[in-house]
């Protein structure tokens, strides 16, 4: 009977755990008894158990007791739970981050870890044990649970005493690990323990590791000390002043030359932080001047700017650019002296310059934004390159009147260009691209200024500029400089000058043309322009259709196809669409030139409605260029138009009219024009191409009047109104 009972549908059962319930494994720490000497693991203890945690109801203490009970361990001892990746102690705060499938380690509590570390470091007998203890502290230095236990059961003074201890300094591993652990703990800023907590004598000990006063110098120790000193400079004004006193910036130069790029970068970063955070302007100026030395430039070149054309470290470039900004800020930009101004005026010996213009130049030089920097660059150019100056002036004098530049205004404008590249004046600087050049030259600003003067002279000549176009030429010169610097990394001033000589005004025009085409293509593919294009397309298609029909109404001469391949006389006929666009008139003619108005007997009129189909039918004419002087005739491709008339009573398949021409454009327009008249849906390549060309022309003309925002230009922020209450009340 049971076999014949009806089937009962089973309902699916959800066996998944609720979201607040997670299940995983717990294993016993192999080093459990090392960190807790009093703990005893019984023989019947289970080393791995599976537990289920209710995250809503259970706290950490409940989970620890449950795990210990499941493992047959004594619940009297204090335990901790540790996650492996990342390695950290589980607390009530991060317990909710556990998911199903977790694997935790039942270990000694954070307090036991700290007490054992403190015992080992306090005894100080076994360097190997001390290294392992500090290594463990370093591993957990970013774990708030263990750091809180460290501050509760021990103190930072323990680590400070290690840094002061000369015996510890002999072990580079112990010292570097201790510095890293201390740095991470202070960076974590648990409680009131921050970088302000470091005492003066510890700062002195760390400074000695950098300045060369320490007995030994090791890469990892040096790296950790440099990083900590920078944090002390940034973190607090008091520790900053201690660093500025204990660490002369000159002692950091030798670290920039290290083969280990990490040390060089940390040394540069510390230099920049010391200069940036220095509260006294006079002291900051002294720090900057200490870097204007040849050993520093050589150190940067040998370590961070080595040749080879490889990809530069972006962090290194950022640090070097900041160094250069500091060096540039120390440039002498105060107003030049009267003697310096007069020296510049004496260089311009042209008799055509009036006294009034000289006074104006004198005033402009004295008020120039670059001050003495501009005056020194001009004088240096005249003194170091007198032959170049004579050549420039002699070429300039040979130009027609009105097409010459004036030396001093040209020099001042070139100084403006160099100042913008160096960020002496507001603008878009190119320090990152000039960085190798800047560190390869003792006086980079005058050297780059000289290159700009030569480029300005060449561009003026190539543009055929006139007297009032100084600003126009200057804008082109600035763009030329930016493009040359963008193309590749330049190693020195000589290479910059050589690259500028090969970069003409015509090359700049080609770049502008390509950029303009690129911008137009981007604009043409924007969503707004695509929508406008779809709206304009019907109008353009109608214009092209009318244009093709008008072309047909003008008429054209075609060759008649020949039935035989003999050298018979070629026959031609003239096809023309009438004004009503309803009839095609075909007239025979004697040659390729049709004469309008001549009476002919062989005239035929074909109604457009009688045309069934229009197709192309090309053929090869092997007699087109044959003559009695050639042994073999050449070939010519003739484009054919095949007009299929509708069937009549006389002809079942309909008559076929053929017209041949060597003009491909004429053939395509007639073919597509007739197809349009009879309503054929054949592919219209010429029509579509012309529609696209006209659409692009129309869109580009319309976009000429659209002002596009430049992403590099910052919008002008209006000033706050004087009476802001009344302004707000209006809205």
From Swiss-Prot:
Question: Assembly state and interactors?
Answer: Interacts with psr-1. Forms a ternary complex with ced-2 and ced-5.
Question: Position of motif SH3-binding?
Answer: 715-718
What SUPFAM superfamilies would the database entry show?
ARM repeat
Domain comment as written in the entry: The PH domain binds phosphatidylinositol 3,5-biphosphate, phosphatidylinositol 4-phosphate and phosphatidylinositol 3,4,5-trisphosphate in vitro. Required for punctate localization in the cytoplasm and cell corpse engulfment. Required for distal cell tip migration.
* Source domain of life: Eukaryota
Keywords for this protein: Apoptosis, Cytoplasm, Lipid-binding, Phagocytosis, SH3-binding
Q: Does the keyword Zinc apply?
A: no
Describe the disruption phenotype. Deformity in the gonadal arm. Defective distal tip cell migration. Defective cell corpse engulfment with an increased number of cell corpses. Absent actin 'halos' around early apoptotic corpses, which is likely indicative of defective actin reorganization around the apoptotic cell. Double knockout in an unc-5 or unc-40 mutant background suppresses the distal tip cell migratory defect in the respective single mutants.
Gene Ontology molecular function: enzyme binding; phosphatidylinositol-3,4,5-trisphosphate binding; phosphatidylinositol-3,5-bisphosphate binding; phosphatidylinositol-4-phosphate binding; proline-rich region binding; protein-containing complex binding; SH3 domain binding; small GTPase binding
Location (main, coarse) = cytoplasm
Q: Which InterPro entries match?
A: ARM-like (IPR011989), ARM-type_fold (IPR016024), ELMO_ARM (IPR024574), ELMO_dom (IPR006816), PH_domain (IPR001849)
Gene name linked to the record: ced-12
Enumerate the spans annotated as PH domain. Answer: 544-679
- What GO cellular component term, any one, is given? cytoplasm
State the protein's name: Cell death abnormality protein 12
Q: Is Cytoplasm one of the keywords? A: yes
Question: Native species of this protein?
Answer: Caenorhabditis elegans
Q: Where is this protein localized, as stated in its record?
A: Cytoplasm
